[in-house]
Amino acid sequence: MGGCVSVSLSCDREVNQFSQWLCVSGSYIQNLSENLASLQKAMGVLNAKRDDVQGRINREEFTGHRRRLAQVQVWLTRIQTIENQFNDLLSTCNAEIQRLCLCGFCSKNVKMSYLYGKRVIVLLREVEGLSSQGVFDIVTEAAPIAEVEELPIQSTIVGQDSMLDKVWNCLMEDKVWIVGLYGMGGVGKTTLLTQINNKFSKLGGGFDVVIWVVVSKNATVHKIQKSIGEKLGLVGKNWDEKNKNQRALDIHNVLRRKKFVLLLDDIWEKVELKVIGVPYPSGENGCKVAFTTHSKEVCGRMGVDNPMEISCLDTGNAWDLLKKKVGENTLGSHPDIPQLARKVSEKCCGLPLALNVIGETMSFKRTIQEWRHATEVLTSATDFSGMEDEILPILKYSYDSLNGEDAKSCFLYCSLFPEDFEIRKEMLIEYWICEGFIKEKQGREKAFNQGYDILGTLVRSSLLLEGAKDKDVVSMHDMVREMALWIFSDLGKHKERCIVQAGIGLDELPEVENWRAVKRMSLMNNNFEKILGSPECVELITLFLQNNYKLVDISMEFFRCMPSLAVLDLSENHSLSELPEEISELVSLQYLDLSGTYIERLPHGLHELRKLVHLKLERTRRLESISGISYLSSLRTLRLRDSKTTLDTGLMKELQLLEHLELITTDISSGLVGELFCYPRVGRCIQHIYIRDHWERPEESVGVLVLPAIHNLCYISIWNCWMWEIMIEKTPWKKNLTNPNFSNLSNVRIEGCDGLKDLTWLLFAPNLINLRVWGCKHLEDIISKEKAASVLEKEILPFQKLECLNLYQLSELKSIYWNALPFQRLRCLDILNNCPKLRKLPLDSKSVVKVEEFVIKYKEKKWIERVEWEDEATQYRFLPTCRLR
């Protein structure tokens, strides 16, 4: 009997448990619709809480001084995961509801409905749990202050991860204060140090400031101090005039109060930190120094006992890098190409620079014959002894692959500049034209188009590097420059063909055995005070003497034996006040740059230079006159910007006589602008114009400035003028235009014009890119609605190509434009100071296409609080882009 009772109790318990399970399981199915509705409601509540928290974070983080708490980020990340699961459930809910039968009490597939219903309940509990956790008193904390400028870096990096971790970990060790990285050129030292710099920008490391300095060969204390001073905000006219000891003291006084990291790229000798003003890093101050160099010996001199060698890539990583550069399409274009590509990779000896350059060169070679030719050419690299001789022929292959001798000559020409020198593209193309690499017979515009095409080819071939911030400059990698000089000298056989001793501190002419063999000579950036002698340079075509700040005198005999000289650059020689009359003997001269010199008059002999095409006289602030310039019958470009000599009626008459003139940059007073209507050739040629009134000559100013709609005008600056209105008129030489139009005007600067109330004339500049308006006390509108209606037959939408708008000290400014504008290209809106009445910006929720790249910079905290946004959507779109400067 007792046994029966025991069995009965056991069965009852199991039946009870089964019935409970059945009840719960049944609820998964029977209550599915209600559970889904509860889940949707709970998810809506959770999303609302998330949006509230995210909004708080955005408002607190946009200044850059705070960062979100880790626990808040975990909560937000978990919501994202939950939301994905919720969307997954929701995507099949209709099918699951239709699977139910018997009024929802059963299912056509009980197992499937049970599993789905259980997922709904489990997710509902998680959502409710997350919702209850989403109550935060604070959502951000003070961000660690680490001033780091993130540097651009190539997209394809292979084989450096382990070395990056090794260097970073070493740098973070308490007992390590200086880290030295050494290795051959082109091996990736700069890339590695750049990654270290950028890692600081992401992780901080507890440092106040990270300073990046490119040192290079023959660097001076002044150059290094200037780079550090710029980062610390010390630069300026007064600071530049101090001696190195005073600058060192200033640097030291700033850095001794900071925990800093100093990154020195490409040092060739010991850098005396004390002389520069940098406190020596130690355990006490917690500061760090890291540097790259070609020499292990330099590491020892810098006090590094265990420097890290950056070696070439191993075979596997080298092959991976070449594959990425060549691309799968090219490698797959013929079954034999991968095998030949491996041979090419082996010939590069693991040098990243060679792999990058040759990989990009071969990326469009898709025939087996081209790859066979590549392996044949690269085989000759083994015929040279020494590392340099193994590298340069490899690099030369990309040079050999350039189409045409003109492109090759243009590339080699870039090696005349110092290491790491940023060369302005426009200046470089003018050099190329005068050298004859580019023909100008069909006009300046076509010649420049060809020049930019060549530059694009050289950049894409990795033979030139385009500026990271300034796209108008290019530079050369050190090893590529060495290769170019090697080619210039006929692979080292005739080194005197090209003398390049730029930026090495010369104070007298170099010793050259055979001056008659010299074709190009670059002595720029040196310490000449006088240039004496009469070298017999009968083959000399190019002579660079610019940036010799101490140069006072050039002897009369110096230019006597240079009959072939076509390019002479004497710019930025600030102590040079006169030129010898013997310059008239440079009968082949086509390019003369005297910009930034202190010359007071042009030598009479200059008038004899009948082949002169380009004359640059910008920033010649003591130059009294250029009368007689009409004798230069071949002149095409005249640059006079910021010169003491301005465009007056007499000069206009002379320039009108120059039949080949195509480009002028000049200053002019507002009262003389109207004279341009009388001199059509001069008007057509003006590309940069600087309109300035002289306080001592008020009779030259006007109340209404009438601008001729100059088609070629690219840049206009109106500074300290007294006019109260600017009007546009069609020019006599463009009468066929319906409306006056500045079709090429891209840059406008207006400063200190207190009488102006609006700039409505900008409606006639449809291709404007940069607009800067400063210190116009009575300016009320950029574009006036009333005036626009009076001058236009139909509405024109302004600023469609505007990229940067800079406004400063405009106390009466109320409006930029009366309606919201699309601003398809706008990247930066600067409201720098004292624009208190500008409350409404021409923005709505659809303005600015790439809002993620857009920034609104402002200097007064109260200003952003007074902004009247179009609506909440507009505020939500643009408030995170605002940055307090």
Curated annotation (Swiss-Prot):
Phenotype upon changing V473F: In strain: cv. Cvi-0, cv. Kas-0, cv. Landsberg erecta and cv. Mt-0
Effect seen on changing V702I: In strain: cv. Cvi-0, cv. Kas-0, cv. Landsberg erecta and cv. Mt-0
Effect of I138V: In strain: cv. Cvi-0, cv. Kas-0, cv. Landsberg erecta and cv. Mt-0
Annotated consequence of substituting A407V: In strain: cv. Cvi-0, cv. Kas-0, cv. Landsberg erecta and cv. Mt-0
SUPFAM superfamilies xrefs: L domain-like (SSF52058), P-loop containing nucleoside triphosphate hydrolases (SSF52540)
Effect of V275A: In strain: cv. Bur-0
Result, substituting I57V: In strain: cv. Bur-0
Keyword Kinase: no
One BP annotation, GO: response to bacterium
Outcome (variant: E419D): In strain: cv. Ct-1 and cv. Tamm-17
Keyword Transport: no
Residues of the NB-ARC domain: 141-443
Result, substituting H294R: In strain: cv. Ang-0, cv. Bla-1, cv. Bur-0, cv. Ct-1, cv. Cvi-0, cv. Kas-0, cv. Landsberg erecta, cv. Mt-0, cv. Pog-0, cv. Tamm-17, cv. Tsu-0, cv. Wu-0
One protein family per Pfam: WH_DRP
Outcome (variant: R877G): In strain: cv. Landsberg erecta
Keywords: ATP-binding, Coiled coil, Leucine-rich repeat, Nucleotide-binding, Plant defense, Repeat
Gene3D superfamilies given in the database record: Helical domain of apoptotic protease-activating factors, P-loop containing nucleotide triphosphate hydrolases, Ribonuclease Inhibitor, Winged helix-like DNA-binding domain superfamily/Winged helix DNA-binding domain
Binding site for ATP: G183, M184, G185, G186, V187, G188, K189, T190
LRR repeat feature ranges: 517-538, 539-561, 564-586, 588-610, 611-633, 634-655, 657-679
Job description of the protein: Disease resistance (R) protein.
Extra remark beyond the main annotation: In contrast to RPS5, which is absent in cv. Landsberg erecta, RFL1 in present in both cv. Columbia and cv. Landsberg erecta.
Family as reported in the entry's similarity comment: Belongs to the disease resistance NB-LRR family.
Swiss-Prot/TrEMBL domain comment: The LRR repeats probably act as specificity determinant of pathogen recognition.
Protein name: Disease resistance protein RFL1
Underlying gene: RFL1
